[in-house]
Amino acid sequence: MNFNDFHCGCMKPCETYSYAQYGVQANPPSKSDLPMAVLFQEGEQIFLTDTEIFLEPGYLYLIDFIFLATPEADSFMQITPKINGTLQLLYSFFAPTGSASRNASASGSFTVPVTENSASVSFNLTYPDKVRNIDISGAVSVTLLHKIKGTKC
């Protein structure tokens, strides 16, 4: 797949736009997907259902995330994005805490080309069994970048 494969191929630019931002404020169990709430959402290609962001086919999307959490000292949290239910370790973020601090943060970005069928994106939180409780907050931003070549404008 090349960069030029994502251009629309129409005589004029595609006039579709869609972007959203979702907030997270929770204390979920380890190995669970983070619940999100809509902060804002424009367009029809991106929508949220509790823990999953759905992306309509035919577009390239940019996903940005930032999270701040309070696991216990000498511990960690790990945020792993899931695309269509599959953990994406390439985009995973491991955030350790030190002996004097309980704060951990994670951030990253990645693109998702959605060609034929809609795709779902979620964020899985993992932390050690010794951590009794973790408070996490953050935001996920989703931006439709452009139409993928070969799909109708």
Language-model features: locations:
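Extracellular jelly-roll beta-sandwich "head" domains, especially the C-terminal globular C1q domain
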Residues: 2-153
